[in-house]
Structure formats: structure tokens, C-alpha cells
Amino acid sequence: MNAPGTKAVGSWSGGRYLRFGEAIEPERLEAMLHPGDGIDTVLTADAYGQGEADELLGRALVGVDRDGFSLIGAVGHDFYEGERQGPRGFPRFTDPALRTPDEYAGYLRMAVERSLERLGQDRFDLLLLHNPDRTGYESEAVWEGMAALRQAGLTGSIGVAPGPANGFTLDLVRCFERFGDRIDWAMIILNPLEPWPGELSLDAAARQGVRVITRVVDYGGIFWDDVTPETELPTGDHRAFRPEGWIAEGRAKLDRLRPTAGCARSH
């Protein structure tokens, strides 16, 4: 199994599945997701495009030596039996309206096997529990099911990927404390302009030996230095739901960081 590298690219990029930036052509996104040029870790989630992101990444991986890249997957939103709940997306598989705890392991195995089939692969290097609800954080049955997937060889390691930035800290810390002997990784929102609440969980992760992947490291594109208050975000772009004025405020903070970073304003 290949551990995640220090840099990664995910199938949510390219504006096709999560409306982050301008939607690019599938062929261009496939080329971007093709491992190589120093980025050999690729991530996907089965809920993106209801499996379409898996399929696109699968095309990008055709012919690539399996030992030459790290593959990270994520499952948790049930688009097989659940109905989309507007902007909240599909319900978690732990929704009591969908199944009982004794069915969690079966769902997880089914979801992972179907995701791997779409990807054209036989295993993940890391499998994440995607945007868990309270049950996902606290249920023994959930983490027994996740550990069983590792035991079965469908993934080399397992972890958790909390959802929106607000409100996950205490749930995540408790999850580490209860199931840290089983959890290998956590993927959290963390960057210099958005330290809260991600950094509040770092000590708990360290105590349990849980390794951390950070996401949204560019603060919605601010650190690329090409997002300005005049930037027109595409319709439905999820960055448009951030608080009003976040771009101007982020740019002002970025300017204060320039002397330390040794870079000049690009605009």
C-alpha cells in the first residue's frame, strides 16, 4: 500500500462536481488527475456526480502503474437509496430512515466495491468516512465496518473526513478518543487564514497517532493570488456562500504575509 504524499489532487477540482471554479472539459480534468509531475496522490468521493467523478478518475488512471500512486477514496453519502436533500446533498448512510446499525457494514462494503469498480481498481490506499453525522462519529458499528474493509484488503488504511468547517471539533476529538486505535488518518480544513476549528483537533490526533491531511489549504483560492473582490464567481460556486467580504479580508491578510513569504502582489 502507498501512503498519501505531501501533495494531492482531487476529483472535486475542475468545477464539474462541486462547483469550485469554472467547469472544465472532462478530457482536461482527466489530464490534470493523471498521477505524475510530483503529484502522485489522487482523491475522490463516490458521491461526487453520483459516481461520475470515480469514473472520470478511473479513466485518468488507465495504464498507470498501481505502485506509482496513492489512491484515496471516501464514502458515506447514500445516493443509492437516499434522496437528494437540496443543497445538503444526499443523506448519510447512517440515517435511521435508510438502515439500522447492523446494516452499516454491509452498506460500507457495497459502496466501496462499487466505487473501486468505477475506478477500475482493486483497492484504496486510504478510505475516508465522508462528512459523517453524529452517528458516524460515535457508532461502534460504523468503525467496525470501516476496520473490516481494511482487514479485507479493500483499503490499506482508514480515516475520517469531517464536513463543513463549523462544529466538527468536539465530535472529531471524541471520535479519536473512542476509535483512535482503528483510525489511521483524518482530513480536516486547515490553512493560515482558517486555523479554526481544525487546529483544535490536532493535539487529540497526535495523542492517538492519527495522521492528518489538510484541505482547503489555499483558502478558497486566495493563496493563488488570482482571486480578487472583482472576481465573478460562477453561478452556484460554493465559495459564494462564504461570509460577505471574505475575499477582501483575505486579500488584506495576504498582503500582510507577503514580506514573510518574499513575494510581491501579482495584480
What are these regions, as identified by a protein language model?
Residues E22-A23, G82-P91, D226-L233:
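Short, flexible, mixed-charge acidic loops at enzyme active sites
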Residues I39, Q121-F124, T155, I183:
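A structural motif
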Residues E25-R28, N131-H267:
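Beta/alpha (TIM)-barrel catalytic core signal, keyed to glycine-rich beta->alpha loops juxtaposed to Asp/Glu
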Residues V9, V42, L57, L71, ...:
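Conserved, mostly hydrophobic/aromatic
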Residues E22-G36, P101-L119, A165-F176:
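Short, acidic/polar
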Residues S13-P26, F93-R109, H130-G136, A165:
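Active-site mouth loops of central-metabolism enzymes
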Residues M1-G73, H77-E81:
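N-terminal binding-site loop/beta-alpha segment at the start of enzyme catalytic domains
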Residues R114-E138:
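Active-site groove signature of glycoside hydrolases
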